[in-house]
């Protein structure tokens, strides 16, 4: 008799502060809003069929996979082609670029190159903590193959991880509690990666304008903590697929 579809509360609690407080022209915010609406609709359709149509199977698995795959393609195309998704790399003193940034802090001069499109991904244990997809396909000599490889990995990650919160949603408070911790950690990484001083000091890729996502993740953490009050044992409401699918994609979208 415990009500479900409580994830709608989480979505509203995230969307309203984001729309009111964030720069809606920021491409990272746009991607997260698209992800939120898209997975929210898939989760809502699944819960609606289960609750109101008395069909325990919910939305057919093939439609879920199709929706997640389409979302992965949209996110991949935006990330690959949008001019605002760039990085700035730290330079040595003997390296010079036309539009370099020189940042001086306590006589410690740091040089950053011009904004550049890149398929580099931060991964620990790799050289310089980065994996460059272009090096996997011949140093950028085969851009189509590089894009297809990047697209495959993005789509695979989205379809594989999007249901991860479902695995923890069966125990009271577990999904929201874990998600709040993950969200807070990712919010810190967004701020650090969007700040050239901290990014350079901690050897993290500097991504301009990424720190705008701190507002989004703060809303997400607040929504999870607030929902946890009613979802902890004994649970008064469950988030349902509309919540669990969206939560998974919140975390996954930030990681991508």
Labelled PLM ranges:
Residues 54-57, 205-206:
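Short helix/strand-bridging catalytic loops that position acidic/His residues to coordinate divalent metals
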Residues 9-41, 70-121, 126-127, 149-256:
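Alpha-helical transmembrane segments
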Residues 1-2, 56-68:
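Juxtamembrane helix-capping/reentrant segments at transmembrane boundaries
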Residues 39-50:
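Alpha-helical transmembrane segments within multi-pass membrane transporters and channels
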Residues 51, 59, 123:
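Short clusters of hydrophobic/aromatic residues that line enzyme substrate/ligand-binding pockets
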Residues 1-2, 128-145, 204-214:
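Short aromatic-rich membrane-water interface segments that cap or initiate transmembrane helices
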